[in-house]
């Protein structure tokens, strides 16, 4: 279970006394998620999520994340809304960790998204980008192109233990992407981690977007590239162009891509795949003793990179004018 910090009943009761959310009826740890400690709270007033932020989330970034969720929720986006204390603060401390309570969203994530899910996700992504357009705070993407070589340095010596010639392939990818990475694309607030487990559905419609703790200021099309990687590959490693077409068309129905974004899409998809391959590789090679959370397979994204290297045109992802 992804509960890294144990919370005694007495400490939780004292923490909740600062909130106007009714009396606690029950609570339980949530197994999903690998970055933070999460609990489901059931009170006399409703259901909530309590999150304790562990070491991978920088405390100085929390005002950005919490402010963004409040901003997006106020503009009608279905996302967790931080619950403020009676004193008006959203961020507290519990068992030595920064902690926040957010609203509970109905819905379930899908493990095997279909074309209709990809279409709904494209609309939701465009809605997120629009809702965040006037958010005043900025946060640079700490896992963009400048971070990839330092990440690789943590794993380079052992990379070929994971797959033959992985280090050589990665060095070539880094050189190519660092040379050509676009810096002038339309941008603003992006989610940057919109995998299937961070999107809730009721039926075929998106009911909520969660886990904004990689959100940052970057290119909108890079966010789309992350989603194409996460949603449109099949278990056998093939790219499903029908899903890609549905996602891109739905996104463009709300926010048409500019020609320079379309031209950059193959490069952005390569970069998105490399980013997740590298963070997974570092985690794979540094599993702490006794860890209960299994690291994600970096080779899934090595295989996706092999596809992206062959792509020369955004049409291969399903884009059409």
Curated annotation (Swiss-Prot):
GO terms for biological process: threonine biosynthetic process. It is an enzyme of class 2 (transferase). Gene3D superfamilies: 3.90.1200.10, Phosphorylase Kinase, domain 1. It comes from the Bacteria. Pathway: Amino-acid biosynthesis; L-threonine biosynthesis; L-threonine from L-aspartate: step 4/5. PANTHER family: AMINOGLYCOSIDE PHOSPHOTRANSFERASE DOMAIN-CONTAINING PROTEIN, AMINOGLYCOSIDE PHOSPHOTRANSFERASE DOMAIN-CONTAINING PROTEIN-RELATED. InterPro entries: Aminoglycoside_PTrfase (IPR002575), Homoserine_kinase_II (IPR005280), Kinase-like_dom_sf (IPR011009), Pseudomonas-type_ThrB (IPR050249). The keyword DNA damage does not apply. This is Homoserine kinase. Belongs to the pseudomonas-type ThrB family. It comes from Methylobacterium nodulans (strain LMG 21967 / CNCM I-2342 / ORS 2060).
């Amino acid at each position: 279970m992804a509960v890294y910090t144990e919370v005694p009943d007495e400490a939780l009761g004292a923490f909740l006394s600062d909130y106007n959310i009714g009396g606690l009826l029950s609570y339980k740890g949530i197994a999903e998620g690998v970055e933070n400690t999460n609990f489901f709270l059931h009170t006399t007033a409703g259901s909530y999520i309590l999150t304790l932020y562990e070491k991978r989330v920088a405390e100085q970034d929390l005002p950005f994340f919490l402010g963004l969720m409040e901003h997006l929720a106020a503009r009608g986006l279905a996302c967790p809304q931080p619950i403020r204390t009676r004193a008006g603060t959203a961020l507290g401390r519990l068992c030595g960790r920064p902690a926040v309570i957010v609203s509970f969203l109905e819905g379930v994530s899908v493990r095997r998204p279909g074309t209709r899910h990809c279409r709904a996700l494209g609309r939701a992504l465009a809605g997120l980008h629009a809702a965040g357009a006037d958010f005043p705070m900025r946060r640079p993407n700490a896992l963009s192109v400048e971070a990839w070589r330092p990440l690789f340095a943590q794993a380079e010596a052992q990379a070929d233990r994971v797959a033959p010639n992985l280090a050589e392939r990665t060095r070539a990818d880094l050189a190519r992407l660092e040379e050509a990475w676009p810096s002038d694309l339309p941008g603003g607030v992006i989610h940057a981690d919109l995998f299937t487990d961070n999107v809730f559905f009721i039926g075929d419609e998106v009911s909520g977007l969660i886990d904004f703790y990689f959100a940052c200021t970057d290119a909108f099309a890079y966010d789309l590239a992350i989603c194409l990687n996460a949603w449109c590959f099949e278990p056998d490693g093939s790219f499903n162009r029908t899903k890609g077409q549905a996602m891109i068309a739905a996104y463009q129905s709300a926010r048409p891509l500019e020609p320079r974004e379309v031209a950059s899409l193959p490069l952005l998809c390569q970069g998105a795949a490399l980013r997740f391959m590298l963070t997974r590789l570092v985690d794979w090679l540094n599993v702490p003793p006794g860890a209960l959370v299994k690291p994600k397979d970096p080779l899934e994204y090595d295989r996706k990179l092999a596809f992206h290297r062959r792509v020369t045109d955004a049409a291969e992802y399903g884009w059409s004018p």
